[in-house]
Regions:
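Primarily recognizes the serine-hydrolase "nucleophile elbow" in alpha/beta-hydrolase
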Residues: 104-166
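The feature captures the conserved acid-bearing segment of alpha/beta-hydrolase catalytic domains
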Residues: 156-229
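Conserved alpha/beta-hydrolase "nucleophile elbow" surrounding the catalytic nucleophile
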Residues: 34, 124-126, 206
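Short, flexible, mixed-charge acidic loops at enzyme active sites
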Residues: 69-84, 161-165
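Acidic beta-to-alpha connecting loop that harbors the catalytic carboxylate
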Residues: 36, 207-210, 242-243
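Alpha/beta-hydrolase active-site loop
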Residues: 79-113
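Short, surface-exposed "cap/lid" segments of acyl-processing enzymes
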Residues: 10-73
Length: 277
């Protein structure tokens, strides 16, 4: 496997892994967004979920204020935003910015690496899963396959987790409610299923993930299976022993892949190989 390539594209930090096997012609591309939990940078996510079994370019994009965009080399700025306003200073702007940055970053990376964007897959973990779901729901970028790991399916559930950590209720208002509605992908399942070609989707959910996120995962899979012409194109893999993170703390720098992450990696890779073509 070639060495990781790092840099920025359209202002977005990236880690790119070249195809690990010879491919004839331009190879497909898998674009992945990391967690805010560990692994919490593009480089760390590439190490935790390298997807080496997929004959494609694997592009890991950095979330706002993470990795090369961290403030003062740490995550304090992210924590401050979550404390200040979990919905309007953290969840909504992070997901929205990452989704808005994607097309320009993808175009620049395609010019540099020459991958085939007509065969694109999206992958996301936790809050990065909400970015991937936003891409699917907005339907502007063609996507051939998708995989989500412990995704943030409903923003209200993420806010609920922050409420628990801060031990205080979130002060919901109309603006926050509207933002949360846009990041409720069970409610938006009709938009995801309305793509001209319905995207095969694998949702990996840890048995030890937060209960609210496990419930949301079940609800999204059920909603999409109801709407898909081929319900088997939507699958839920519930993984024993998997909590929310995919890596150990601090999760900023690349680290050896954990055995549980290898299990997730194999599950996602098998799905992408089957559907990316």
């Amino acid at each position: 496997m070639g060495e990781p390539v790092t840099g920025t594209a359209a202002g977005v930090p990236f880690t790119v892994l070249p195809p690990s096997a010879e491919v004839s012609g331009p190879a497909p591309v898998v674009v992945a967004w990391h967690m805010i939990d560990a692994p919490r940078s593009d480089a760390a996510f590439a190490a935790a979920l390298p997807l080496a079994g997929v004959p494609a370019w694997r592009v890991y994009l950095g979330m706002p204020l993470c990795g090369a965009r961290m403030v003062d080399g740490g995550m304090d700025a992210v924590v401050e935003r979550a404390r200040r306003d979990a919905m309007l200073a953290y969840v909504d702007p992070f997901v929205r910015q990452a989704a808005l940055e994607f097309p320009a970053a993808l175009a620049e990376l395609r010019e540099r690496f020459g991958f085939d964007t007509s065969r694109t897959a999206v992958v996301g973990g936790s809050l990065g899963g909400a970015v991937a779901l936003t891409i699917l729901a907005t339907r502007e970028i063609p996507v051939r396959a998708a995989a989500l790991i412990n995704p943030a399916v409903r923003a209200r559930s993420v806010v609920g987790l922050v409420e628990g950590m801060l031990d205080r209720p979130y002060p919901w208002n109309d603006e926050a409610e509207q933002a949360a509605d846009q990041l409720d992908f069970v409610a938006r399942s009709g938009e995801i299923s309305a793509r001209e070609t319905q995207v095969p989707l694998m949702l990996v959910s840890g048995e030890d993930d937060h209960p609210s996120l496990r419930t949301d995962a079940d609800d999204l899979v059920a909603a999409l299976r109801e709407r898909y012409a081929r319900p088997d194109d939507v699958q839920l893999a519930r993984v024993a022993g998997l909590a929310h993170p995919l890596a150990e703390e601090p999760g900023i720098e690349p680290a050896p892949q954990l055995p549980i992450a290898k299990l997730v990696d194999d599950t996602v890779a098998e799905w992408l190989v089957r559907h990316l073509g």
